Amino acid sequence: MMPTETFGRTGHRSTRTIFGAAAFSDVTQAEADRTMELLLRFGVNHIDTAASYGDSELRLGPWIEQHRAGFFLATKTGERTSQAAYDQIRRSLERLRVDQVDLIQLHNLVDPAEWETALGPGGALEAAIRAREEGLVRFIGVTGHGTTVAAMHTRALERFDFDTVLLPYNYPMMQNPIYAADFEELLARCRERGVAVQTIKAITRAPWSDRPQTAATWYEPLRDPVAIDRAVHWVLGRPGIFLNTVGDIGVLPMVLDAADRFRERPSGDAMREIAEQQAMEPLFV
């Protein structure tokens, strides 16, 4: 059964496996509809999308319109200035066919200059606060990629009391001692404050490099069912964090199935074995 946990201070009892709707960036409505039926069968009750995810918000709209009460709904703005971010939030609501989203997130906020702009006077954070005051959003979060993101999120929590954070977490990346230490510091801070921690890139195998891109993801995902099981169970085996699913509807069913069968975290030896067998590499260095 899909495990659930309270999503930080929001109070929502979310499935620990969150649907990463980047998977809907470039699919037909029929493909999106079949995927949404799959989510309902597995009991997933939390969706994470973004304004920059192609057609994702548009594909979600018809379903959200009919099933709004069944999902915690999050989107993101990648704009860095207040008015541009506010306008994008309003467009996201229109595309999603809702009057309010549960969570708005400042998208991929890692670059120091962009960070200062977004969190400073006239920045995107002001738009998120305004949207919350107007009832367009309920909570505010921050997301990011890369090896510095955990440290940047810790800094962000000193600047503003964000409700959620989102960042990479997988076995290869946590072998980087600096990133691992930064992640642990962030996680401790989030636990103190009741901040929900979402994680991405659980089933990353490696960067595409020169290999043909055979999935919708911008990294090469694991395909072997045993490897996917171990990667997913390794993430879910860490208490207090959520797993946002892969951005490819073809790989998604294996991730959902693995999450549904989660019982315990694989051992370090088991993860080292699968990492070697699959030639897993960190996506960010």
Regions found by a protein language model. Name each.
Residues G70-T81, L103-H107, L167-Y169:
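A short, structured active-site edge motif that brings together acidic residues
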